[in-house]
Amino acid sequence: MKALLNKDIREEIQALIEIAEENLSAAKILFENKLYRDAVARAYYAIFHSAKALLLTKNLNPKKHAGVIKMFGLYFVNEGYIEEIYGRIITKSYNLRWKADYTTDKPTEEEAESIIYEAEMFVDRIKKALKEIL
């Protein structure tokens, strides 16, 4: 089903996807330079911004991270439109980003590599969903 969205919302969705792609590119560069803490954060923000883009298709615009995660689960995963793995990815990435930003625990190379891979999967899945909706 195609969403009836005004031009401003469509432009905001496109801008969020561009931000997600930039964050994903930055995560890869940071990873290559062994800056795992920042790589994890950028990978999370790639997921976060792409999830926000999808939420806008339902005129939902939560301001907080927890709201994005909750609404993504309620309106897309629980409804069966997006596979459950993506609900797990957004939650896992949030928790890892929180650990990276607010504790002295440094993410491992494996954690950073895994979350970047999952962020790429997530962004690709959201872009596919947006093509179907828009």
UniProtKB/Swiss-Prot annotation:
Similarity comment: family membership: Belongs to the UPF0332 family.
The protein's name in its UniProt record: Putative toxin MJ0605
PANTHER family linked: TOXIN MJ0605-RELATED, UPF0332 PROTEIN TM_1000
S-S bonds: none
Function: Putative toxin component of a putative type VII toxin-antitoxin (TA) system. Its cognate antitoxin might be MJ0604.
Lineage: Archaea, Methanobacteriati, Methanobacteriota, Methanomada group, Methanococci
Pfam families: HEPN
Native source species: Methanocaldococcus jannaschii (strain ATCC 43067 / DSM 2661 / JAL-1 / JCM 10045 / NBRC 100440)
InterPro entries tied to this protein: HEPN_dom, UPF0332_toxin
Gene3D superfamilies tied to this protein: Nucleotidyltransferases domain 2
Taxonomy, superkingdom: Archaea
Record keywords, A-Z: Toxin-antitoxin system
Keyword Oxidoreductase among record annotations: no
Alphabetized SUPFAM superfamilies for the sequence: Nucleotidyltransferase substrate binding subunit/domain (SSF81593)
